[in-house]
Amino acid sequence: PIVGDLRGVLAGINEAVAKAGAKPITAPWLAQIAEWRRRFPFYHSDLVEDPGRIVPETVMQKLSRKLDPKHSIVVTEVGQHQMWAAQFIDREKPRTFISSGGLGTMGFGFPAAIGAAFGRPDDQVVCVAGDGSFQMNSQEMATAAINGVPVKVLILDNRALGMVHQWQKPVSYTHLRAHETCA
């Protein structure tokens, strides 16, 4: 084991690596990633919006372009919209995309967005939500209003718990399937 002060140990390791002339071997890996992205894109350009149809991937791309990358925070609720937001909203700074990850904590996003707005009052805060997850804590709109917190909320309404449908469909749990959540 290496025992020592982290700053000194890392400086020593970096110096030894530089003296040895070691170079990262990332070129083949980056080429592989580029090939995968070409073959298996997140987004198919043939998905076109038309009257009566909204393509969630396009919504996220448009939102991403509207946000100031240096002075905005995106917080997600939990569901399919969370995946689209993670894939299509560009962020330049750390801690400007807040999500509960894979924890499945529906209702996390809006209160977290309110907290982010309190923590960074000069930044624009947007909560990306689905109709199912937003209803878990929609009462927090009162908290935001009472405290004058200017959080914006984008709700994608598919009238269902979309991710529940998505994962029940492959195993044919038709009798257990989540149905409409909002009128």
Model-derived features: where do they sit?
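Residue-level signal for well-ordered alpha-helical positions
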Residues: I13-A16, F88, N147, Q166-W167
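Glycine-rich, acidic loop regions that bind phosphate or pyrophosphate groups
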Residues: P1-Q32
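Active-site-proximal loop->helix
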Residues: A142, M163-V171
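Generic recognition of stable, solvent-exposed alpha-helical segments in well-folded globular domains
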Residues: P1, D5-G8, G12, I54, ...
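Single conserved hydrophobic/aromatic residue that forms the stacking wall/gate
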Residues: H175-A178, C182-A183
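Thiamine diphosphate
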Residues: M83-L161
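Active-site diphosphate/adenylate-binding microenvironment
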Residues: A34-A117
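Short, hinge-like loop/turn segments at secondary-structure boundaries
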Residues: R91-P94, K169-Y173
